[in-house]
Amino acid sequence: MRFDEAYSGKVFIKSHPSFEESKVVIYGMPMDWTVSYRPGSRFGPARIREVSIGLEEYSPYLDRELEEVKYFDAGDIPLPFGNAQRSLDMIEEYVSKLLDADKFPLGLGGEHLVSWPIFKAMAKKYPDLAIIHMDAHTDLRESYEGEPLSHSTPIRKVCDLIGPENVYSFGIRSGMKEEFEWAKEVGMNLYKFDVLEPLKEVLPKLAGRPVYVTIDIDVLDPAHAPGTGTLEAGGITSKELLDSIVAIANSNINVVGADLVEVAPVYDHSDQTPVAASKFVREMLLGWVK
């Protein structure tokens, strides 16, 4: 990678040219094969990179600059269009290689099903893994119209994998009644509507544990993030999400990886959704990578 590519919009701003020297690897997962409403999130990773050139490199939230963190933007995984299972297998294989290389994986989606193979790779490396999940939707279905590979299923899958007591969902305001009932019955940690305040209560309980954080951009109210596939009114503000990212940064949990998914820029001609997403990525880089 040439030096000037760090400001080209082809990679996330200020990306380091060396994979070997970088602690973090940013990678895209341009998949939206299973969405139930509006497609387009496969274009999210590229647009987040493009608009990142408008970011300041300094975070007043964390008093750090991007210069202080070495991260490499690997581009997008070349997923086979329309083949969900093969795409998921490729994501799991790639993330497993990053973990073997002792990298911090930071994924850009893409629909939320892309998180499922990441969860599997993470659980293999970290037996005591916990999940922090911020989203408008429960994502607790076993299947959608008979199809188990759906963006409405990844949190149910990870509950079955690591135990529902190790999964913490915040900002939830949409889902089937049966999903909410199931979460309550099995002891999953599901917090409706809000993110920051319940998160502050949970973080001390997770001190010292390896935690993977997955953020669906639709946790935000559509006024703050119209560019997503399945809009849900009544969400949180971009400030609350920023404050939540900072709260995690200031906690004693061990964040071992993260993703930001469901940005669909085609529905947001002002670019406010990918612009917000790029800022969230900046704070994740500066706050979560130790």
UniProtKB/Swiss-Prot annotation:
Keywords: Hydrolase, Manganese, Metal-binding, Polyamine biosynthesis, Putrescine biosynthesis, Spermidine biosynthesis
Transmembrane parts of this sequence: none
Function: Catalyzes the formation of putrescine from agmatine.
Coiled-coil intervals, chain numbering: none
PROSITE patterns the UniProt entry points to: ARGINASE_1, ARGINASE_2
Binding site for Mn(2+): H112, D135, H137, D139, D216, D218
EC number: 3.5.3.11
Gene Ontology MF terms in the entry: agmatinase activity; metal ion binding
Pathway: Amine and polyamine biosynthesis; putrescine biosynthesis via agmatine pathway; putrescine from agmatine: step 1/1
Alphabetized InterPro entries for the sequence: Agmatinase-rel (IPR005925), Ureohydrolase (IPR006035), Ureohydrolase_dom_sf (IPR023696), Ureohydrolase_Mn_BS (IPR020855)
Protein's GO biological process: putrescine biosynthetic process from arginine, via agmatine; spermidine biosynthetic process
Pfam families: Arginase
UniProt cofactor(s): Mn(2+)
Family that this chain belongs to: Belongs to the arginase family. Agmatinase subfamily.
NCBIfam families for this protein: agmatinase (TIGR01230)
Record field: catalytic activity: agmatine + H2O = urea + putrescine
Protein name from the UniProt record: Agmatinase
